[in-house]
Curated annotation (Swiss-Prot):
GO terms assigned for molecular function: alanine-tRNA ligase activity; aminoacyl-tRNA deacylase activity; ATP binding; tRNA binding; zinc ion binding
Cofactor: Zn(2+)
Protein name as catalogued: Alanine--tRNA ligase
InterPro entries: aa-tRNA-synth_II/BPL/LPL, Ala-tRNA-lgiase_IIc, Ala-tRNA-ligase_IIc_anticod-bd, Ala-tRNA-synth_IIc_core, Ala-tRNA-synth_IIc_N, Ala-tRNA_ligase, Ala_tRNA_ligase_euk/bac, DHHA1_dom
SUPFAM superfamilies: Class II aaRS and biotin synthetases, Putative anticodon-binding domain of alanyl-tRNA synthetase (AlaRS), ThrRS/AlaRS common domain, Translation proteins
Record has Ligase as a keyword: yes
Organism, as annotated: Thermotoga petrophila (strain ATCC BAA-488 / DSM 13995 / JCM 10881 / RKU-1)
Taxonomic path: Bacteria, Thermotogati, Thermotogota, Thermotogae, Thermotogales
Record PROSITE patterns: AA_TRNA_LIGASE_II_ALA (PS50860)
Matches recorded under CDD domains: AlaRS_core (cd00673)
Family: Belongs to the class-II aminoacyl-tRNA synthetase family.
Record field: catalytic activity: tRNA(Ala) + L-alanine + ATP = L-alanyl-tRNA(Ala) + AMP + diphosphate
Length: 863
């Protein structure tokens, strides 16, 4: 076999299958278009809808090199030659086209003829009941029977993913590395009986069955092929090395780690593990952040944070005490950037996010490790409450706590960890959402089967309809008089709250009555329910009515919805492609947009975004709406949210040259109708997620009027011109600070400060205050010594559930007493720390309830 680089292997695979009639598709995102998955874990994930029969394939033959991420075995990464978080999966797929024979023959052809792998180095396994696969390997390929292992369902049968679904046998191809590890004495080594010698390099899955609820298999009308081969394993094979970490995919990264840490690779096994962990994790970190995932305490962000913190801890084991991971990003980008240009485009952003996260974690890690050691010293073990405290207070992910415990040989019991986690999250979760849905709307069973409300609100703000169902107190009724009820009409122009856009409001009128529409929602797919209040007359089932949407409210909402799309586009342009929508609210009076970004926007960035949006508004660009297939929409570059469900036909809202999104909301027909766009706030929602609130149209005008009124009031109160207001306010602020200081010192100086005389004649002046900030205590201590001339001053203040402390020692006592030592002694008792100089020191603590004990034993702390 000739040596081949990773680039050559990747290119050879794709070219080979292109010649076999496959469409070569680029790698999909690591963030799948699938709400059931956090990450793309295999090459087949982007094609799940096709395998599941939900979508018709555009191409029947496809080949890809897919970037993937898995953390299920993260504790093994670095300890074995082939476990990884981020990896690349080569794969060829057939959707109802070729099947077993071609899949096996082409895999063999690629391995033996393109890569030049000696046939004697290859073994295979097949499902024990799959005679067809056995026959192809034996008769078509010519592989001897002894090199075809028949294995059970656990080893050679894939799926289904749940209790039911597509599934089928598979065949695995193994490469014999030649290493005689774990082979039984007197027996020939095979993939079934050796440990580590044979490496699985390719898995060919034959999806030919559907498993029903009873576990029975039924032949599928359309059979599919799904194959996966790890590029990292191919590289190890073609580069003549046993470990994936010795390939050209990892060596440049490992070299960079050696430079930064000063630790040589392959000099010490424990340190080698740490180097491998960092090398692996840096690939995952770089790709995740470049795709807009940021460290946080939930979902993808939590997984990223775990990976970063695990890499950091191994850096600490190599002697690193400052942020350093961000300095490895360029090595990853240099190696992988030609194939995945997104990591080059996002390189500076990745470094910035990573550096900030490293700094944040280092501040808490040292304290967390001290607490870990204290718990172990006291209890000899870690329990669920301890593990949660380490996570919640000190930022140690549970997995990291478990790993540290294993290394130290400490027993861990975390059975109740999730209970503590759930309790913490309880208040922030809308935990009753699913229960509410299941409990309510039973009255919908009264509707005709397959009933759908006809929505006419894209074209009309007024329409005629018929009352199909009336419900009160969760039960269907025949009529309603002066009541608040929920009503289903045959058709409606009212938009139901969905996709972040609030519902329409308006009126319903009939021959002798009228009602207000207060809220509209979709209770089940296609069934729109109107929550109304009958003002006059009696509304009856079967009644013909006229439904009128509040025109001004709808138009204001439309302005804000289109502006939200423009804002999304502007944020991507100003901040980068990593920006993704993380939530929104579109109301008539304002819009709110949550998005992924790693830090607050500067004033300059906010102005850039505002200017861009207003430029697009001024250009009066026609807004286009069209319906197309989901596949065509995605191919055209449309922005879709992975959390949303889309049908076969989707609605695309496009502002040509600016924005293109899948959206079911209502929009203006021309950007000029928005009028004016103004950002009113920008803030953090959670780690890695920012929020912008903005107004448009008449709301902007109202905002400007209110601001003008405020400025006029300030001018009158301060007796200043508009251009003098800033200086005048700053001057007032300084005066207030000075007055507060004087007031605080004056008030405290009047308090009775106790005095105690020591055996050596030295006097100790001490006092405890309420709600006095630490910054004022030093001045009070100065005043005491000015008045008393000599002595030791110890002042404590309970402020915001914490304790602040200052100690001051007069010059004549410095040979006997050290303020820094006294402060540290007291702070330790109060659960804190501190220090300073011999004549003056400051400290803090977390246990104000222990102050009384400190005062009772004051002399002890002076020693």
């Amino acid at each position: 076999m000739r040596y081949m680089t990773s680039e050559e292997i990747r290119e050879a695979f794709l070219k080979f299958f292109e010649k076999k009639g496959h469409k070569i598709l680029p790698s999909a995102s690591l963030i799948p278009d699938d709400p059931q998955l956090l990450f793309t874990v295999a090459g087949m994930v982007p094609f799940k809808p096709i395998f599941w029969g939900k979508v018709e394939p555009v191409y029947t033959r496809v080949a890809t090199c897919q970037k993937c991420l898995r953390t299920v075995d993260i504790e093994n990464v670095g300890k074995t030659p082939r476990h990884h978080t981020f990896f690349e999966m080569l794969g060829n797929f057939s959707f109802g086209d070729y099947f077993k024979e071609e899949a096996i023959e082409w895999a063999w052809e690629f391995l033996t003829q393109v890569l030049g792998v000696p046939e004697e180095k290859l073994w295979v396994s097949v499902y024990e009941e799959d005679e067809e696969a056995f026959r192809i390997w034996n008769e078509k390929i010519g592989l001897p029977e002894k090199k075809i292992l028949r294995m059970g369902k656990e080893d050679n049968f894939w799926g289904p993913a749940g209790p039911t679904g597509p599934c089928g046998p598979d065949t695995e191809i193994f490469y014999d590395t030649g290493y005689s590890k774990g082979c039984p004495e007197g027996e020939e080594c095979t993939p079934a009986n050796s440990e580590g010698r044979f490496v699985e390099i390719w898995n060919l899955v034959f999806t030919e069955y559907y498993q029903d609820e009873e576990g029975k298999l039924h032949p599928l009308p359309r059979k599919n092929i799904d194959t996966g081969a790890g590029l990292e394993r191919f590289c190890a094979m073609m580069q003549g090395v046993y470990s994936n970490f010795d390939t050209d995919l990892f060596q440049p990264i490992i070299n960079r780690i050696e430079e930064l840490t000063g630790v040589g690779y392959k000099t010490d096994e424990e340190k080698d593990v740490s180097i491998r962990v960092i090398a692996d994790h840096m690939r995952a970190i770089t790709f995740l952040i470049s795709e807009g995932v940021f460290p946080s305490n939930e979902g993808r962000g939590y997984v990223l944070r775990r990976i970063i913190r695990r890499a950091m801890r191994h850096g600490i084991l190599l002697g690193m005490s400052e942020p350093f991971l961000y300095r490895i990003v360029d090595a990853v980008a240099e190696k992988m950037g030609k194939v995945y240009p997104e990591i080059v485009r996002g390189e500076s952003m990745v470094k910035e996010v990573l550096s900030a996260e490293e700094s944040r974690f280092l501040k808490t890690l040292e304290q967390g490790m001290k607490v870990f050691d204290e718990i172990v010293e006291k209890k000899g073990r870690i329990d669920s409450e301890d593990a949660f405290k380490l996570y919640d207070t000190y930022g140690l992910p549970l997995e990291l706590t478990l790993e540290i415990a294993r290394e130290k040989g400490v027993e861990v019991d975390v059975k109740e960890f999730n209970k503590y986690m759930e309790e913490q999250q309880r208040k922030s979760r809308v935990a009753l959402g699913d229960v509410e849905f299941a409990r309510r709307y039973e009255y919908l069973e009264e509707l005709p089967k397959d009933f759908r409300t006809e929505f006419t609100g894209y074209e009309k703000l007024e329409d005629e309809g018929e009352v199909v169902l009336i419900a009160k107190n969760e039960k269907a009724v025949e009529d309603a008089t002066e009541d608040a009820v929920e009503v289903v009409f045959s058709k409606t122009p009212f938009y139901a709250e969905k996709g972040g856009q609030v519902s329409d409001t308006g009126t319903v009128e009939w021959e002798d009555g009228k009602a207000l529409v207060e809220y509209v929602f979709e209770a089940s797919e296609g069934v729109i329910v109107h929550r109304i209040k009958v003002l006059a007359g009696t509304l009856r089932r079967g009644q013909k009515v006229v439904l009128r949407v509040d025109k001004k409210r709808r138009e204001a909402t439309m302005r804000n919805h289109t502006a939200t799309h423009l804002l999304h586009a502007a944020l991507k342009k100003v901040l980068g492609d990593h920006v993704r929508q993380a939530g929104s609210l579109v109301a008539p009076d304002r819009l709110r947009f949550d998005f992924t970004h790693f830090k607050g926007l500067s004033m300059a960035e906010i102005e850039q975004v505002e200017n861009l949006v207003n430029e697009w508004i001024m250009e009066a660009i026609p807004v286009e709406v069209r319906y197309t297939s989901y596949e065509e929409a995605v191919k055209s570059g449309v922005v879709a949210l992975f959390t949303e469900k889309y049908g076969d036909v989707v609605r695309v809202v496009e502002v040509p040259g600016v924005s293109k999104e899948l959206c079911g909301g209502t929009h203006v027909s021309n950007t000029g109708q928005i009028g004016l766009f103004k950002i009113i706030s920008e803030e953090s929602v959670s780690s890695g997620v920012r929020r912008i609130e903005a107004v448009t149209g008449f709301s902007t005008l109202e905002l400007l009027r209110n601001q003008k009124k405020l400025i006029d009031q300030l001018k009158e109160i301060l007796g200043a011109r508009e251009d003098e207001l800033t200086d005048r306010v700053l001057g007032l602020r300084e005066k207030v600070k000075e007055l507060e200081k004087k007031l605080s010192q004056g008030r405290i100086s009047e308090e009775k400060i106790a005095m105690k005389q020591l055996e050596d004649g030295a006097r100790v002046f001490y006092a405890v205050f309420e709600d006095v900030e630490a910054k004022h205590l030093g001045g009070i201590a100065d005043n005491v010594l000015k008045k008393e001339r000599e002595g030791i001053v110890i002042l404590l203040s309970k402020f915001e559930d914490k304790v602040s402390l200052v100690v001051k020692v007069s010059e004549n006592l410095l040979d006997k007493y050290d303020a820094s030592s006294i402060a540290r002694n007291i702070a330790k008792e109060l659960g804190g720390s501190g220090g300073g100089r011999r004549n003056f020191a400051q400290a803090g603590g977390r246990h104000p309830e222990k102050i009384r004990g400190v005062l009772e034993r004051l002399e002890e702390f002076l020693r």
